[in-house]
């Protein structure tokens, strides 16, 4: 069972809120978020309500300040628990919108999109199996984008403001 605890102040101090399911609007429960304790499951946290804005992927552990989860500020307004998955992984990335241009299929992590794909930009994507995280920079750094099974015809469909993706990886069963 997944559970995350949000704290208004750093180092797990101040008002807090416990959550064990998806929540589209956390604003009634706390005004800011400066530390988080993930007691179970994998979670995607969003800067804005309704699963919008910056996204942060967190696994079990303690995050005493927002920089520990690569946060840009102390604002968390929605969250999603990522279902545990034990199957195979498969995803196709495309160099153009609407699944156009060069395509590559992946079943494993990719620490550098450019080294593998020879492009820095991914304009569309089809996730067939598993849950994935896109990262803005190589080596799993920078802004993060949660990718669940489905078709993403343009980069804004996964919440990005530009098509640059530096790396991606699978959300593995062992992370839970």
From Swiss-Prot:
Annotated region (Connecting peptide), positions in chain: 84-88
SUPFAM superfamilies: gamma-Crystallin-like
Any one Pfam family match given in the protein's UniProt record, by short name: Crystall
Keywords, alphabetical: Eye lens protein, Repeat
Domain Beta/gamma crystallin 'Greek key': 2-40, 41-83, 89-129, 130-172
Gene3D superfamilies referenced in this protein's UniProt entry, alphabetically: Crystallins
Cited PROSITE patterns: CRYSTALLIN_BETA_GAMMA
One example GO MF annotation: structural constituent of eye lens
An annotated GO BP: visual perception
Subunit text: Monomer.
Family classification: Belongs to the beta/gamma-crystallin family.
Domains (record comment): Has a two-domain beta-structure, folded into four very similar Greek key motifs.
Described purpose of this protein according to its UniProt entry: Crystallins are the dominant structural components of the vertebrate eye lens.
Name the UniProt record assigns to this protein: Gamma-crystallin M2
Source organism per UniProt: Chiloscyllium indicum (Slender bamboo shark)
């Amino acid at each position: 069972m997944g559970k995350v605890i949000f704290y208004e102040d750093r180092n797990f101090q101040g008002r807090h809120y416990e959550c064990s399911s998806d929540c589209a609007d956390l604003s009634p429960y706390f005004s800011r978020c400066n530390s988080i304790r993930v007691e179970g499951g994998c979670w995607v946290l969003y800067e804005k309500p309704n699963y919008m804005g910056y996204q942060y992927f967190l696994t079990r552990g303690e995050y005493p300040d927002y920089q520990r989860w690569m946060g840009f500020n102390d604002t968390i307004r929605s969250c999603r628990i990522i279902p545990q998955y034990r199957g195979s992984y498969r995803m196709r990335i495309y160099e153009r919108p609407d699944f156009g241009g060069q395509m590559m299929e992946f079943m494993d992590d990719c620490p550098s999109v450019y080294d593998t794909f020879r492009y820095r930009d991914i304009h569309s994507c089809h996730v067939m199996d598993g849950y994935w995280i896109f990262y803005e920079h190589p080596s799993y750094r920078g802004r993060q984008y949660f990718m669940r099974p489905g078709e993403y015809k343009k980069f804004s469909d996964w919440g990005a403001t530009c098509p640059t993706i530096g790396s991606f990886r699978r959300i593995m069963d062992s992370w839970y």
